[in-house]
Amino acid sequence: MTSSRAAAQHLRDLARLRRVRDRIDREYAQPLDVEALARDANMSAGHFSREFRLAYGESPYGYLMTRRIERAMALLRRGGLSVTEVCFAVGCSSLGTFSTRFTELVGMPPSSYWRRAAGATEGMPPCVAKQVTKPIRNREARVAEPQLT
C-alpha cells in the first residue's frame, strides 16, 4: 500500500472512530458494548479497542465510563436524586462498579461528592461549575478531597 493510500485509510479510520465516540457521547446511558461499537466502525473488537486507545488515549469502555461519571456529577450537583438513582440514570448496572469508578475519577465517593457539591456550586453558572468539578481521566484523581468553593 502506498503512503497516500495508507494516509487515506488512516483518515477513514479516524472518521469512523469519531462517529463511534459521538455515539458514546449521545447514548452513554444505553447498554453499549465494545463488540457493537466495533461493528459500527467496521472493525474487529480487538482492532477497534487498539485504534480507539491510540486515537483518544483510553479504552472505549474507559471513555464510556468517564462520560457516565461526568453526567452523574451533574445529576448529583443538581440534587433531587439518590446516588443509586443517579447510578442507574447514567446507564450503570452495578452500584459497586459505579462507586469505584466515580471514586477513581473524582477522588471521593459519590455520596461524599453529593453532600459537598450540594451547596458548593450554588449561584455559580452551570458552565463554570462543570469546569470546576470536571473529573480527571485515567485514574489521576488527587488523594485529598478537591476544594469546590
Specify the residue positions occupied by each region the protein language model found.
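Short, basic-rich loop-to-helix N-cap that marks the start of a DNA-contacting helix
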Residues: 62-64
